[in-house]
A protein has these predicted regions:
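Catalytic cores of nucleotide-sugar-dependent glycosyltransferases that transfer UDP/GDP/TDP-activated
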Residues: 1-500
């Protein structure tokens, strides 16, 4: 096996190519960190229509131009292209799965970007992707020690390796990371036929009379992780946000842990950030004031440095606290604050937010899109960054905010339980404004505490300065993943887990 491991990282998103959630950030940063530790890491992801081949220097791999993929009774062709990701220290090979029908002709990742409706054939699209991933390895003659899969979009691979490729990949082990337990890949049971897997495996994917991608990954992966310790505990016991699938996860609790996400300190570095006109030099106050003014101009806000700006960059949905913001708006805007919100998502919630913005046109500013450069400007220009989530697997923006000098305001759930220390309770150790109940009054009280903190300039600046001293790099977490990889590789092969 040599000193380094051969690792294939499978993701439906990859920054800077295609990103809709934190998975895209993790898929960039974790493989880079593993590469820096001396491992042969490669990434594979789909080529969506919005991905520019010219910009990202994506090119064909001659022997991978036309791979036939059996989809039920028909065949579709996959062309595997190549690119790289880099942090200027190391480079990681990135394979790009191309197919005109499933990916290349569609601008969105999971949704139609114009309507925000989920593509009706997402099950078929990602069955194709899973098959193409494994076929790419066989065509390359490359057998990874570890295939690391992420969320439901790559959840079929652990079972496929055992059922369809038992000889080629008998030494390969699988690790599966749950980034969001609520999104499970739930489709009509008939979709299972497209996988080509044995009908005897259907029970491992069947849940509540539906084809559940995630259930199969839980049953067949050698090890399962999620993105924070507290979230791992929540989803084991929480029926509400697991669709009841926590009972299946409990069966694998001896091979299930939470590992904290890290920050890609190459992309999220205010001293070198390519998206910032005003980068951090020696004066943190100057950095914040210039970026705040830029943010005010971008969103057509009054150029008043004394009014606190609260930034939000949510996926607009019920998970991220959008409804709570709507319900609390009248009480929130009794305070002299400004909120800027950048995001995309549920159309009903977007319409409801527009009504609030119409009522408070000088206080709430909306931008409905995915915009990576603007997200960096919001972090740099905001005084506070709000994540009033109903549940939160991790919350990468908590760490981005601390690095960029915006004090987080969060609800005490999921990954925030591990990260957030309430300033109100501890001025010396506090790093965030924290509220407990997913209720209007608790949320409004948190806003009021934030405003009071902002008016105490000395304490506010002290907390901003202290927050920047945290080490959020991937190094420690990457080593934890390597330990898991080595652990599962030491274990003898089993035809099936005892629970399947």
């Amino acid at each position: 096996m040599g000193k380094g491991l051969n690792i294939l990282f499978v993701s439906s998103e990859l920054y800077p190519f295609a990103k809709e959630s934190g998975i895209g950030d993790v898929a960039f940063a974790l493989p880079i960190a593993l590469k820096e530790l001396g491992h042969d890491v490669r990434i594979i992801f789909p080529k969506y229509g919005a991905v520019s081949e010219k910009k990202h220097k994506i090119h064909y791999v001659n022997r991978l131009r036309d791979i036939p993929i059996k989809m039920g009774k028909k065949y579709e062709s996959a062309a595997i292209k190549s690119s790289i990701i880099t942090n200027a220290k190391v480079k990681v090979q990135a394979y790009v799965v191309s197919n005109d029908f499933y990916f290349d002709t569609r601008k969105g990742i999971y949704h139609n970007p114009k309507t925000w409706e989920e593509y009706p054939d997402n099950a078929e699209r990602f069955i194709f992707f899973n098959k193409a991933v494994v076929e790419t390895c066989t065509m390359l003659g490359w057998v990874p020690n570890i295939i690391h899969c992420n969320d439901w979009q790559s959840a079929l691979i652990p079972a496929m390796l055992k059922d369809l490729y038992p000889n080629q990949f008998k030494k390969t082990k699988t690790v599966f990371t749950i980034h969001n337990f609520y999104r499970q890949g739930i489709y009509d049971i008939k979709e299972f036929e497209r996988t080509g897997m044995s009908q005897s495996l259907l029970t491992d994917f069947k849940f509540k009379n539906k084809f559940n991608f995630l259930k199969g990954a839980i049953r067949h992966s050698n090890f399962i992780t999620t993105v924070s310790n507290s979230y791992s505990k929540e989803i084991i016991k929480d029926k509400e946000f697991s669709n009841g699938l926590n009972i299946v996860l409990k069966e694998k609790k001896s091979t299930f842990v939470g590992i904290r996400n890290g920050v890609d300190i190459y992309s999220w570095n205010p001293k070198k950030d390519e998206f910032l006109k005003y980068k951090l030099k020696s004066d943190l106050d100057d950095f914040k004031s210039k970026n705040k003014e830029l943010l005010q101009k971008e969103f057509k806000l009054d150029l008043d440095p004394d009014i606190p700006i609260f930034g939000m960059i949510p996926r607009i949905g019920y998970q991220k606290g959008t409804q709570l913001l709507i319900d609390a708006a009248d009480k929130i805007f009794e305070q002299n604050i400004r909120i800027v919100l950048l995001g995309e998502g549920d159309n009903d919630l977007k319409n409801a937010l527009r009504l609030v913005a119409d009522k408070y046109p000088d206080k709430l500013k909306l931008r409905y899109e995915f915009n990576e450069p603007l997200s960096h400007i919001i972090e740099a220009g905001s005084d506070f960054f709000m994540m009033p989530s109903q549940y939160e697997p991790f919350g990468l923006n908590f760490m981005y905010s601390m690095i960029y000098g915006a004090v987080p305001l969060v609800r005490n759930t999921g990954g925030f339980v591990d990260l957030a220390i309430d300033i109100t309770k501890s001025n010396k150790k506090g790093n965030a404004i924290v509220f407990d109940k997913y209720e209007v009054d608790d949320f409004v009280n948190a806003i009021e505490r934030a405003v009071n903190l902002y008016e105490n300039k000395d304490l506010y600046k002290l907390i901003v300065k202290k927050n920047r001293e945290y080490d959020f790099s991937w190094k420690k977490s990457a080593k934890e993943y390597v330990n898991i990889y080595k652990q599962v590789l030491r274990e003898p092969n089993k035809e099936n887990d005892e629970n399947t």
